[in-house]
Amino acid sequence: MRGYLLLLPLLLCLVDNSVSYKPVILVHGLLSSSKSFDKLIQFIKKAHPGTDIYPVDMFNHLKSLNPMWKQVYEIRKYISPIIKNAGLKGVHLICYSQGGLICRGLLETMPEHNVDTFIALSSPLMGQYGMTLYVQKALPLVNISALQEVCYRKFFKEISICGYWRDPHRYEKYLEYSAFLPKLNNELLDSNSTERKRNFLRLRKLVLIGGPDDEVIAPWQSSHFGFYNEKEEVVNMKDQMVYQKDTFGLQSLDGRGAITIYSVPGVLHASWPNNQTVFKNYIEKWLT
């Protein structure tokens, strides 16, 4: 018995060292870069030593205005080997702001992905409408009336933000000219709609984080799959057509208890990836 007791510390050490965390892939937002995740990377390394972390260093700053589908396809080339190497263990995605929409595109177009948890950090998942700082930085010389005309013209519709600009008063124009979000939502059906939904449902867990003091995402409830109706009243996720008709799998995911939603007050948009409280309370637990 004494011999076993002497071996116990060694055995515990071996068990502790055998803990292996899933790789984490980070995708940044509009007019930003992988540097926006510097503090978040520190938080993850401290909480889960040994975690392999892959901040996507692509489409930085003004290049983030490139067409959304172009960003999805190029980033997919980068993360595919990471996902493949992870094997059955799987990976986690943390995707911030515009990056959350890019990650939706990745999930829907990768039939063999093994993403365990997708954490969407203050992302305009159901679109953007309103001249917040987010829009003003991207298109500083354009007001909201002009932006509606810019985004709903063939020449400009490939600008990233126009791909998910969603005017609640002009839904038909949104369907016609927004090159990204209607397809992502399967609001416009095509030969790949069924496959996009099937791919999205490979996801094990969806974590939605946003808050009322964001001041950039408009409406802020878009980070929770809510959006304006034609009266500019916010319609929550479960009352959205894409949820009720389960167009891309949102209702199915929710039905199996796979969606967690956090509404966090007091956090400005630029602070989400740098906020240690946000990490400790709403992110860390999902990165096992």
From Swiss-Prot:
The keyword DNA damage does not apply. It catalyses: hexadecanoyl-CoA + H2O = hexadecanoate + CoA + H(+); S-hexadecanoyl-N-acetylcysteamine + H2O = N-acetylcysteamine + hexadecanoate + H(+). Residues 1-20 form the signal peptide. GO terms for molecular function: fatty acyl-CoA hydrolase activity; palmitoyl hydrolase activity; palmitoyl-(protein) hydrolase activity; thiolester hydrolase activity. GO terms for cellular component: extracellular region; lysosome. The active site is at 97 (nucleophile), 214, 269. Disulfide bonds join 95-103, 151-162. Gene3D superfamilies: alpha/beta hydrolase. InterPro entries: AB_hydrolase_fold (IPR029058). Keywords: Disulfide bond, Glycoprotein, Hydrolase, Lysosome, Signal. Glycans are attached at residues 143, 192, 275. Its EC number is 3.1.2.2. It is found in: Lysosome. Catalyzes the cleavage of thioester bonds from S-palmitoyl-CoA or S-palmitoyl-N-acetylcysteamine (unbranched structures) but does not have activity against palmitoylcysteine or palmitoylated proteins, branched structures or bulky head groups. Conversely, hydrolyzes both long and short chain fatty acyl-CoA substrate. Belongs to the palmitoyl-protein thioesterase family. This is Lysosomal thioesterase PPT2-B.
